[in-house]
Amino acid sequence: MEIKQISEKADIIFSDNAAKKVSTLIEEEQNNNLYLRVYITGGGCSGFSYGFTFDEKRKEGDSSVTNNGVQLVIDPMSYQYLIGATVDYLEDLQGARFIIHNPNAKTTCGCGSSFSV
């Protein structure tokens, strides 16, 4: 009998803290059709910048990660830069914000909102 190992490691991790915050924001908007879209654009002090927005529409080729019924959606171009990353929500002395821990980033800026590969 052959036993296959099933890896439960996701390509992109959507943390519990981030999912809870997104759920709260969706409730405030009173629109259960919203997803959190994470994307990457050119710019920032390190070459690429992370972006977050709410979206109601999924586009062809989008990938998604679900945590506690909340969906995180990523376009194909951004996805390739986010493989292995964790999307999290942090509240500390610097304020409250969504952050990305990205193992693909060679350098990041001081605030963590831009990176280079």
From Swiss-Prot:
Organism lineage: Bacteria, Pseudomonadati, Pseudomonadota, Gammaproteobacteria, Candidatus Pseudothioglobaceae
Source domain of life: Bacteria
Residues annotated to bind iron-sulfur cluster: C45, C109, C111
UniProt organism field: Vesicomyosocius okutanii subsp. Calyptogena okutanii (strain HA)
Subunit structure: Homodimer.
Cell membrane listed as a keyword: no
Function: Required for insertion of 4Fe-4S clusters for at least IspG.
Sorted UniProt keywords: Iron, Iron-sulfur, Metal-binding
Family as reported in the entry's similarity comment: Belongs to the HesB/IscA family.
Signal peptide feature range: none
Family matches, as Pfam families: Fe-S_biosyn
Protein encoded by which gene: erpA
GO molecular function: 2 iron, 2 sulfur cluster binding; 4 iron, 4 sulfur cluster binding; iron ion binding
Cofactor binding annotation: Binds 1 iron-sulfur cluster per subunit.
Names of required cofactors: iron-sulfur cluster
Keyword ATP-binding appears in the UniProt entry: no
Protein name: Iron-sulfur cluster insertion protein ErpA
GO biological process, one term: iron-sulfur cluster assembly
